[in-house]
Structures are given as structure tokens and as C-alpha cells.
A protein has these predicted regions:
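Non-catalytic, conserved peripheral segments adjacent to functional cores
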Residues: 1-85, 100-103, 107, 112-122, ...
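Short beta-strand-centered segments at strand-helix junctions
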Residues: 87-90
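Beta-rich strand-turn-strand
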Residues: 92-96
Length: 132
């Protein structure tokens, strides 16, 4: 199930720092990447992952993420570097409505493996029937 996770923030008059450690995550961090310089009209993602879970946070800017479990879709608005969205494996993800200057940080519990991606929505619906 998707859930919001509050990240640890530290700060004083010099500025703020957000820390992400394995002990604070619902999984062990194996991969980290970020999406940036994305046009507002672009849709990123459009896939599901059989084995990878993810944590999404906008370290600057804002975007929306639609999560689909094969039966229902829910859209989340990310606009705080102090809050992250956890998305378990097996769900369809679409990231869109990127505000100019957005940097979307993504943490995963698996290294990249192209063979675990489901990029066809019809195939995803079949996957949900067999694994739901």
C-alpha cells in the first residue's frame, strides 16, 4: 500500500538538510536516481515494476504521481523535500505535471533490471489478475 513517509529534517539559520537512511525506509536502499529538466507536458514512468519498490520525493519543485493497482488509481501531489511517497512493487506509475525546475528524487530497493519492467498497460492488467 502507498504511504507518505516524513523524512528527517535538520536546520538552523544557515539552512536545512534532509537525511534519508536505510533505517528510516520500508526497504533497504539499493539504487538512487533523479528526474529533472522535465517539460510540464511530459509524462514519465508509464510502467510497473515486478520486483522494485520505490520512494519518491521532490527535492525541489513539484509534480503529481498517479499510482494504479489494476483496479483503482490514486493521484498524489509531491511538493515538499521533507515528505516522500512509498510505492510498493507491482504498481503502475505515471509522473506528470512537473513544475519548472523540479528535481524528483527516486530511491529503489533493487538495482536496475530492464526485464522486470511492464511497459504495456494491457500486460499490466493481466499481471494484476495473476498476482493480485
Amino acid at each position: 500500500m502507498n504511504q507518505w513517509i516524513n523524512l528527517k529534517e535538520f536546520g538552523d539559520h544557515r539552512g536545512k538538510l534532509v537525511s534519508i537512511e536505510n533505517k528510516d525506509l520500508p526497504f533497504k536502499m539499493e539504487r538512487l536516481f533523479y528526474i529533472y529538466d522535465t517539460d510540464n507536458s511530459a509524462v514519465r514512468g508509464n510502467h510497473a515494476n515486478r520486483n522494485s519498490s520505490f520512494l519518491f520525493t521532490c527535492i525541489t519543485g513539484a509534480c503529481d504521481i498517479c499510482i494504479d493497482n489494476g483496479e483503482s488509481r490514486e493521484t498524489y501531489h509531491l511538493d515538499s523535500p521533507k515528505q516522500a511517497l512509498y510505492c510498493p512493487k507491482g504498481l503502475w506509475k505515471e509522473m506528470f505535471n512537473f513544475k519548472q525546475g523540479t528535481v524528483l528524487l527516486v530511491v529503489s530497493d533493487q538495482p536496475f533490471d530492464n526485464s522486470e519492467y511492464i511497459r504495456d498497460y494491457t500486460e499490466f492488467k493481466e499481471y494484476c489478475k495473476n498476482h493480485g
